[in-house]
Amino acid sequence: MASRSFFGALWKSEASRIPPVNLPSVELAVQSNHYCHAQKDSGSHPNSEKQRARRKLYVASAICLVFMIGEIIGGYLAQSLAIMTDAAHLLTDFASMLISLFSLWVSSRPATKTMNFGWQRAEILGALLSVLSIWVVTGVLVYLAVQRLISGDYEIKGDTMLITSGCAVAVNIIMGLALHQSGHGHSHGHSHEDSSQQQQNPSVRAAFIHVVGDLLQSVGVLVAAYIIYFKPEYKYVDPICTFLFSILVLGTTLTILRDVILVLMEGTPKGVDFTTVKNLLLSVDGVEALHSLHIWALTVAQPVLSVHIAIAQNVDAQAVLKVARDRLQGKFNFHTMTIQIESYSEDMKSCQECQGPSE
């Protein structure tokens, strides 16, 4: 009993020497962990948005696949390379829709210790493979068109070409209606401009733009079919259309390739201006300087940011963190943000590592 009293007294004596723990800072850290993901998803319905996007893409890709096969058959029967080129453009649309569907599926897979960013960039690799395959198909069609112009030994069935191209215009209109977004959505805490952009799924919007481009090409093929149907001696219009539409297909894929290279090289994504982000952070009260600002993207529609913010003395770090995060999220809707708060020192003005990148 005496030994218990002795150890109890010893414990009280040693405990009095332990420095006090700063509980408010611990509490703030817990709160910041609580709201950093909760507020990011509050007021939005990502799962229902993805389901709507999937339904639209399923319908459009099914229509696209069926008619692409029909155009290949019709182009073969009509001996028309222009229709074959239009089918190649449909292949571009179909491939982009498959990539979008794949990205919507793979983005729901959880990250692992090995793939700690998740599987987001599988979409980028698929897009690169799609572009390369389309270039091969287009190159073959251009080669055949050159051969036709040189030899002149070919016949085109104007009636079959006319029917097929007319159906192509109708099918592209149907696909456009299936992918068209009415613009109804929900917005909480964002500007009108930001909410109007966010309520449109980027995958569906990209597919819709592809279909509009293919519709214009199909109208061109239809005009060529009318010319050949009434004036069969003008059959050289077909290979000429093949050249023109091949340029259109390559132009479409070049924009995709540019986005792919930008993501793989971890460049600043489209829609996010480096200087604007920097000035927005410097406008937060208490922020004296910033450095190591990096902006890149996991995929085309998922920008990521990391930055070190230097704050003045006696400034609430958690308050600065909250304001900076809310402003960035409200204006740019970053997928992931990592913001490190540190104390400002005068030597940051002359430190080369603390200076921003060149233009």
From Swiss-Prot:
<keyword id="KW-0479">Metal-binding</keyword>
<protein>
    <recommendedName>
        <fullName>Proton-coupled zinc antiporter SLC30A2</fullName>
    </recommendedName>
</protein>
<dbReference type="GO" id="GO:0140917">
    <property type="term" value="P:zinc ion import into mitochondrion"/>
</dbReference>
<dbReference type="GO" id="GO:0006882">
    <property type="term" value="P:intracellular zinc ion homeostasis"/>
</dbReference>
<dbReference type="GO" id="GO:0005886">
    <property type="term" value="C:plasma membrane"/>
</dbReference>
<comment type="similarity">
    <text>Belongs to the cation diffusion facilitator (CDF) transporter (TC 2.A.4) family. SLC30A subfamily.</text>
</comment>
<dbReference type="InterPro" id="IPR036837">
    <property type="entry name" value="Cation_efflux_CTD_sf"/>
</dbReference>
<dbReference type="GO" id="GO:0046872">
    <property type="term" value="F:metal ion binding"/>
</dbReference>
<dbReference type="GO" id="GO:0010008">
    <property type="term" value="C:endosome membrane"/>
</dbReference>
<dbReference type="GO" id="GO:0042589">
    <property type="term" value="C:zymogen granule membrane"/>
</dbReference>
<dbReference type="GO" id="GO:0071577">
    <property type="term" value="P:zinc ion transmembrane transport"/>
</dbReference>
<dbReference type="GO" id="GO:0030658">
    <property type="term" value="C:transport vesicle membrane"/>
</dbReference>
<keyword id="KW-0496">Mitochondrion</keyword>
<dbReference type="GO" id="GO:0005765">
    <property type="term" value="C:lysosomal membrane"/>
</dbReference>
<feature type="binding site">
    <location>
        <position position="214"/>
    </location>
    <ligand>
        <name>Zn(2+) 1</name>
    </ligand>
</feature>
<feature type="topological domain" description="Lumenal">
    <location>
        <begin position="313"/>
        <end position="359"/>
    </location>
</feature>
<feature type="transmembrane region" description="Helical">
    <location>
        <begin position="87"/>
        <end position="107"/>
    </location>
</feature>
<feature type="transmembrane region" description="Helical">
    <location>
        <begin position="292"/>
        <end position="312"/>
    </location>
</feature>
<dbReference type="GO" id="GO:0005770">
    <property type="term" value="C:late endosome"/>
</dbReference>
<dbReference type="InterPro" id="IPR002524">
    <property type="entry name" value="Cation_efflux"/>
</dbReference>
<dbReference type="GO" id="GO:0005743">
    <property type="term" value="C:mitochondrial inner membrane"/>
</dbReference>
<feature type="topological domain" description="Cytoplasmic">
    <location>
        <begin position="1"/>
        <end position="56"/>
    </location>
</feature>
<feature type="binding site" description="in chain B">
    <location>
        <position position="291"/>
    </location>
    <ligand>
        <name>Zn(2+) 2</name>
    </ligand>
</feature>
<feature type="binding site" description="in chain A">
    <location>
        <position position="36"/>
    </location>
    <ligand>
        <name>Zn(2+) 2</name>
    </ligand>
</feature>
<dbReference type="GO" id="GO:0062111">
    <property type="term" value="P:zinc ion import into organelle"/>
</dbReference>
<dbReference type="GO" id="GO:0010043">
    <property type="term" value="P:response to zinc ion"/>
</dbReference>
<feature type="topological domain" description="Lumenal">
    <location>
        <begin position="229"/>
        <end position="236"/>
    </location>
</feature>
<dbReference type="GO" id="GO:0006829">
    <property type="term" value="P:zinc ion transport"/>
</dbReference>
<keyword id="KW-0050">Antiport</keyword>
<dbReference type="GO" id="GO:0140915">
    <property type="term" value="P:zinc ion import into zymogen granule"/>
</dbReference>
<feature type="transmembrane region" description="Helical">
    <location>
        <begin position="57"/>
        <end position="77"/>
    </location>
</feature>
<feature type="topological domain" description="Cytoplasmic">
    <location>
        <begin position="181"/>
        <end position="207"/>
    </location>
</feature>
<keyword id="KW-0677">Repeat</keyword>
<feature type="topological domain" description="Cytoplasmic">
    <location>
        <begin position="108"/>
        <end position="123"/>
    </location>
</feature>
<keyword id="KW-0864">Zinc transport</keyword>
<dbReference type="GO" id="GO:0140916">
    <property type="term" value="P:zinc ion import into lysosome"/>
</dbReference>
<comment type="function">
    <text>Electroneutral proton-coupled antiporter concentrating zinc ions into a variety of intracellular organelles including endosomes, zymogen granules and mitochondria. Thereby, plays a crucial role in cellular zinc homeostasis to confer upon cells protection against its potential cytotoxicity. Regulates the zinc concentration of milk, through the transport of zinc ions into secretory vesicles of mammary cells. By concentrating zinc ions into lysosomes participates to lysosomal-mediated cell death during early mammary gland involution.</text>
</comment>
<feature type="short sequence motif" description="Mitochondrial localization signal">
    <location>
        <begin position="34"/>
        <end position="37"/>
    </location>
</feature>
<keyword id="KW-0862">Zinc</keyword>
<feature type="binding site" description="in chain B">
    <location>
        <position position="342"/>
    </location>
    <ligand>
        <name>Zn(2+) 2</name>
    </ligand>
</feature>
<keyword id="KW-0968">Cytoplasmic vesicle</keyword>
<feature type="binding site" description="in chain B">
    <location>
        <position position="308"/>
    </location>
    <ligand>
        <name>Zn(2+) 2</name>
    </ligand>
</feature>
